[in-house]
Design a protein with these regions (language model features):
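Short, hydrophobic alpha-helical segments
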Residues: 248-252, 282-293
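Nucleotide-sugar donor-binding catalytic core of glycosyltransferases
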Residues: 1-227, 267, 272-276, 280, ...
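Short beta->alpha junction loops/turns
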Residues: 191, 236-237
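A short, well-ordered alpha-helix in the C-terminal region of glycosyltransferases
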Residues: 253-268
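Catalytic phosphate/metal-binding cores of nucleic-acid and nucleotide-processing enzymes, i.e., regions
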Residues: 206, 216, 237-240, 261
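C-terminal "capping" alpha-helix adjacent to the active site of nucleotide-linked donor transferases
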Residues: 237-253
Length: 306
């Protein structure tokens, strides 16, 4: 890996976590503000691009960059092939790599230490959290806004009925610590699908109750969340309380799912694993480019010799 120098300009806080993860690999990674934002170069050759915007489609800014350049790989946040037919993007359809919205508390807090045993065995006095944004800058509420608001109110009502729930937004550090005391979480997709919540819950061992995802929402490192393995699916917001009660009443099931979650994080989603995954995709793409160029040059030499 010493033969590669990677220059990137990940200009947004969404991608800061990926930059930090890449730097754990030991490869020569330079954050270069002099190249265009979101571009990825290997040995001074343009290889890839990262599309992090909150959209299942590519944005106008993405499309402009894609039209003006020939990226060989595009890392796409919020990739959802069952919602969007990506063949509309022509040559780029087979170059898109889904990568979800990944982050770790390690990037946010230098003092954070992930302790699997502690996370697995610690008391969790909070039954349910529903601390999620339910509106954005739009004046008109989207369907997801109403559902998220409904779930937040449901958590509040459960609190009034004797459950210990969290539903008010709080500061990031307080939220991080509170997740460690939380058993389950209500979450529903928004404009940007599930966003950061997935990794926040997985890293802290919180069991998501969410609408069905399946292969419609692949995360980075080829991770696909499975029902009753890593989370619990429910397609009816009106049934979330019943699902939570059933789950909380079954500690064996809770422990099984939590162990699966933490095993998944440890084996696929740590900083180092994610960094190596991104690096592998980038380097493999670069090597294919080099091989293709060698073949082109050989054909040219052959034609010139005839």
């Amino acid at each position: 890996m010493n033969n590669y120098k990677i220059r990137i300009n990940f200009s947004h806080h969404y991608t800061r976590h990926i930059l930090v993860a890449l730097k754990t690999t030991g490869v020569d990674i330079e954050h270069d503000p002099n190249i265009k934002p979101e571009f990825i170069y290997v040995n001074d050759e343009l290889v890839g691009y990262i599309a992090w915007w909150d959209s299942l489609k590519f944005t106008p800014a993405n499309l402009k960059d894609m039209a003006e350049n020939d990226f060989k790989i595009i890392f796409k946040f919020h990739y959802s092939p069952n919602v969007i037919d990506y063949s509309i993007y022509g040559k780029y359809e087979d170059r898109i790599v889904p990568c979800g919205l990944w982050r770790t508390w390690e990037t946010e807090d230098i003092n954070y230490k992930w302790n699997k045993h502690n996370i697995m065995t610690r008391p969790r006095p909070i039954d349910v959290t529903a601390q999620m944004r339910h509106i954005n800058s739009s004046k008109n509420w989207y369907p997801w806004s109403h559902i998220r608001y409904q779930l937040k109110n449901l958590a509040k009502a459960m609190n009034d009925r004797g459950f210990n729930t969290s539903f008010k937004m709080i500061g990031r550090k307080a939220y991080e610590k509170k997740l460690l005391d939380t058993n389950t979480a209500f979450i529903w997709s928004a404009t940007s699908y599930l966003g950061w919540k997935v990794c926040e819950f997985l890293e802290q061992g919180v069991i998501m109750i969410t609408e069905p995802l399946g292969k419609d929402y692949p995360l980075c490192n080829d991770v696909v969340l499975e029902d009753d393995v890593h989370c619990v699916f429910c397609n009816d917001p009106n049934q979330f309380e019943a699902v939570a009660k059933q789950l909380l009443a079954d500690p064996v099931r809770v422990n099984r799912i939590r162990k699966n979650i933490l095993d998944l994080w440890q084996s696929k989603l740590t900083q180092n694993h994610v960094g190596r995954w991104y690096l592998k995709k980038i380097i493999e793409t670069y090597e294919v480019m080099q091989s293709q160029m060698k073949n082109i040059n050989k054909e040219k030499e052959l034609m010139e010799s005839i």
